Amino acid sequence: MDFSDLDYSDAGDSGWTMYLGHSSSVSLHHFDYHNGETKQEHDEDSSMVSDASSGPPYYCEETVHEDHLQQNTQYWCKSKSKNKNKNKKKVHEEQGYSERFNSSFDDTASSLPVGEEVSAHKQHQNQYQRFHDFCQSYSTRRICKEKVNSGFLQQAFPVDKLALDNQGGDNQRKRRG
């Protein structure tokens, strides 16, 4: 394959090389404060200039007709204004929600939830209370039914007597019912 006839393989400068070459050859004007003269220097150090691109330079030569530009701009502005109105409405709704539920004086750690969340909070509290009551009654029944081997606990809590009283109480209830 012969690469000599391809555009990007010629020895010409790429876009970066031409840009960097132009920027490095710009003449600099300095004012000498001691003599009051303006000196012109040429910076021709090309050691930092490199050809970073291997392809041909690309130039944008397309012209945009003014009519198309105006039409696109008008369409864009109209669509943006419609979106702004929707966004404003959404922001107002969100602000109203946050104002109802978040007061700057409320402490979120100690304050109760407001609105629909209150019923969920109460329901959760009720479930927790039922669980807590169940645990206490279960552990009380367990203590009453088991024999305790410690002499101190037997003196402080006559477990056998409590267990017998509870059993006797159950029998009395059955007889009444």
UniProtKB/Swiss-Prot annotation:
Domains SOFL-A and SOFL-B are required for function in cytokinin-mediated development. One of its GO terms (cellular component) is nucleus. Keywords: Cytokinin biosynthesis, Cytokinin signaling pathway, Cytoplasm, Nucleus. It comes from the Eukaryota. This is Protein SOB FIVE-LIKE 6. Its main location: cytoplasm. Involved in cytokinin-mediated development. PANTHER family: OSJNBA0091C07.3 PROTEIN (PTHR33347), PROTEIN SOB FIVE-LIKE 6 (PTHR33347:SF34). Belongs to the SOFL plant protein family. The lineage of its organism: Eukaryota, Viridiplantae, Streptophyta, Embryophyta, Tracheophyta. Expressed in seedlings, flowers and siliques. Barely detectable in roots and leaves.
